[in-house]
């Protein structure tokens, strides 16, 4: 019997999840159908629950419903608890289970690039939900120190405060975007400023070996500045594929190879 999956969000037309999951299915021999679902901004829960009531096997959650999905779950993975957001749902024994595969997607993408994560010092620009979701997996993969830089320093400090007990093996630090300096192994842009006219200028006293832009498919001043410095860079398509692979594995028990889809 064909398994039914969906991705839910608002807007949703831009999602590439159906093409990815159908490509994974073709490669692995899993019989599935994967659709986009547009939910009204005030209708996430009813739309999600009706999908599972109709026999749906699993659902991905995208903007703006990840925090709502987190709040509705009966059972959460450790990484979802830390992220306080859920992008992967499934039913088991009548209970709604939730996970967050975004951070694992980023780790898989960085590993596929053969950028070493072991004992690294990482700078993340931005202190929003995207950053919260990747800290724990980065530390699990070997990051030793993570510095979170944000325009509003208090928000970065709050995030460090929230997460330090979850990752005691790593050093977390908060700084203002105005105080960017020092040497880093990897710099990750988790802000949306690279996609707008409000682009951040990276100061000369800030040095980094690799640059990762979480967004993809749009002009990025962050990537432009990495190019100017001749720093190896990548944008977020690998992370998108990586998080989708992790969700596919949770649901179907088989893990496609990331390199086959980049």
Curated annotation (Swiss-Prot):
Which BP terms does GO give this entry? amino acid biosynthetic process; aromatic amino acid family biosynthetic process; chorismate biosynthetic process; shikimate metabolic process
Reactions catalysed, semicolon-separated, are:
shikimate + NADP(+) = 3-dehydroshikimate + NADPH + H(+)
What GO cellular-component annotations does this UniProt entry give? cytosol
Q: Give the binding site residues for shikimate.
A: 15-17, 62, 87, 102, 216
Asked if the record carries the keyword NADP, the reply is: yes
Q: Can you name one GO molecular function term for this protein?
A: NADP binding
What is the main EC category here?
oxidoreductase
Q: What is its EC number?
A: 1.1.1.25
Q: Which CDD domains match?
A: NAD_bind_Shikimate_DH
Catalytic site: 66
Which pathway or pathways does this protein act in? Metabolic intermediate biosynthesis; chorismate biosynthesis; chorismate from D-erythrose 4-phosphate and phosphoenolpyruvate: step 4/7
Q: How does it assemble?
A: Homodimer.
> To which protein family does this belong?
Belongs to the shikimate dehydrogenase family.
PANTHER family noted in UniProt: BIFUNCTIONAL 3-DEHYDROQUINATE DEHYDRATASE_SHIKIMATE DEHYDROGENASE, CHLOROPLASTIC (PTHR21089:SF1), SHIKIMATE DEHYDROGENASE (PTHR21089)
Record's function text: Involved in the biosynthesis of the chorismate, which leads to the biosynthesis of aromatic amino acids. Catalyzes the reversible NADPH linked reduction of 3-dehydroshikimate (DHSA) to yield shikimate (SA).
Spell out the protein name for this chain.
Answer: Shikimate dehydrogenase (NADP(+))
- Native organism is Acinetobacter baumannii (strain AB307-0294)
């Amino acid at each position: 019997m064909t398994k039914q999956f969906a991705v839910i969000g608002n807007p949703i037309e831009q999602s590439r999840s159906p093409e990815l999951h159908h490509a994974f299915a073709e490669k692995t021999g899993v019989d599935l159908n994967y659709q986009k679902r547009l939910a009204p901004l005030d209708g996430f829960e009813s739309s999600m629950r009706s999908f599972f009531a109709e026999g749906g096997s699993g659902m991905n959650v995208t903007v703006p419903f990840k925090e709502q999905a987190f709040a509705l779950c009966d059972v959460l993975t450790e990484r979802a608890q830390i992220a306080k957001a859920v992008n992967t749902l499934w039913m088991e024994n009548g209970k709604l289970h939730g996970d967050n595969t975004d951070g694992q997607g980023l780790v898989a993408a960085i590993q596929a690039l053969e950028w070493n994560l072991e004992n690294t010092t990482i700078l993340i620009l931005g202190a929003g939900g995207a950053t919260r979701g990747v800290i724990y997996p980065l530390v699990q993969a070997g990051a030793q120190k993570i510095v979170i830089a944000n325009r509003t320093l208090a928000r970065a400090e709050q995030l460090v405060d929230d997460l330090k007990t979850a990752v005691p093996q790593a050093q977390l630090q908060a700084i203002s975007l105005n105080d960017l300096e020092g040497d880093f192994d990897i710099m990750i842009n988790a802000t949306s400023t690279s996609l707008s006219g409000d682009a951040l200028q990276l100061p000369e006293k800030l040095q980094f070996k690799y640059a990762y832009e979480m967004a993809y498919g749009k002009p990025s001043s962050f990537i432009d500045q990495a190019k100017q410095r001749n720093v190896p860079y990548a944008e977020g398509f690998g992370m998108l594929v990586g998080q989708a692979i992790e969700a596919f594995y949770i649901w179907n028990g088989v893990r496609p190879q990331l390199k086959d889809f980049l």
